[in-house]
Amino acid sequence: MCIRDSFAAALPMLVAQILNLLYNIVDRIYIARIPHIGTAALGAVGLCFPLVVIITAFANLFGSGGAPLFSISRGQKRNKQAVHIMNTSFTMVCFSAVVLMLIGLLFARPLLILFGASKDALVYAFPYMMIYLIGTLPSMIAIGMNPFINAQGYSTIGMFSVAIGAVANLLLDPFFIFALGFGVRGAAIATVISQCLSASFVLFFLTKKAELKVRFLHKNELSESLGYAKNIISLGTAGFIMQLTNGLVSIVCNNVLSVTGGDIYISVMTIVSSVRQLVETPIYAMNEGGSPILSYNYGARRPARVRKAMVVMSAMILCYTAVMWSVIIFAPGTLIRVFSSDPSLVKDSIPALNQYFAAFIFMDLQYIGQTVFKSLNKKKHAIFFSLLRKVFIVIPLTYFMPYVLHMGTSGVFLAEPVSNVIGGSFCFITMLCTVLPELRRMDNCD
């Protein structure tokens, strides 16, 4: 894997991830500019972020969990097994989407209160959440099955499937929010329509055009698929836990901020989270672009190419993050004003952003380690490090620093860099100490 190959693999993924980011980011940009209620509505919609994370986490549990196994099987020339893995993932994606939608619709209000919503915030958050939930199935199909398009070498098609929905959302948002006067509800409607368009294209391609085509599992295949399902869930659990704990951290942060800073700091956290999504998107793209290459060459027993892919992917990610970290530290207002022009909100967001991203480059080490572990089917390592940083470091610190050390809202934002340094370093060092010796042994055996 040379630098050219890395860019070739990562570029379509980068464009796809940026376009996918538009689903939520564009909503927030437009919502923040609704006259008179923009700042309050922005915070309220930010309270729905854990729900979006949960839906995405389940989609990736089966999609990103299945795609590396799919790639490994293709690398081993076992196409029949690869198709069975993809069909198993697809069936699980659809079933879980229906279950999540029903649970969400039944318990939307208590969930939002759990997420930290005040009575005022519920006015905007509840209708947005109810409409968004209707699009759970198309959302999960678009997210969960797109990795199988990329894993077959159709990365440009994968990018296009995301582009369809993202561009539609970009155009429909102002129409429903401002032209029709639907406000927050309009943003949710536009998102659901856009997700339906993306899902339709993904299904069309995977059922009609792809080399290896997808379908629902037949009844007589269910028992045989249990083994594949367990492996998919085992491998996808690391990313699932990482995303799910992102939602848990968001809930904890919003609850602490609502006490220490009030509703305005929910809006501040929404902006900080939005900037993080914006900055992380190319990192995700580079990881996802490199993951099939790592998996394929590992399955084909080509350790030299696995090592080279690891080095190139790591170098690209670290260089990019160094540039973005400089922008965040030295020009934070530029990024914040993308999401809101409210002077008081911008003023409160600048120190919060600087604190939150103080040691962000260490987070790269976590991402690189997680991607390598996942791509090489190292389930236990991937799951452990998913849990370590979020559950055992950042969440306790989010309570400890504001309440015990009396740091107020600053304690919430500073919990992130402390966890980045500890968790990221530990994950990366462990990856080097476990994966590199295995690759050397593979060299010797061959």
PLM features: what roles do these ranges have?
Residues 1-10, 70-135, 181-236, 294-359, ...:
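Short alpha-helical transmembrane segments in multi-pass integral membrane proteins
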Residues 60-63, 132-150, 158-166, 187-202, ...:
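Short runs within selected transmembrane alpha-helices of multi-pass transporters and secretion channels
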Residues 8-27, 131, 165, 194-198, ...:
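Transmembrane helical elements of multi-pass membrane transporters/channels
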Residues 18, 22-43, 112-119, 175-182, ...:
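Helix-terminus/linker motif at the lipid-water interface of multi-pass membrane proteins
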Residues 39-50, 125-129, 188, 261-278, ...:
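Small-residue hotspots at the loop-to-helix junctions and early N-terminal turns
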Residues 104, 147, 173, 177, ...:
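Structural signal for membrane-spanning alpha-helices in multi-pass inner-membrane proteins
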Residues 42-102, 139-158, 254, 266-326, ...:
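Small-residue-rich hydrophobic transmembrane alpha-helices
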Residues 4-37, 50-65, 69, 94-101, ...:
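N-terminal transmembrane alpha-helices
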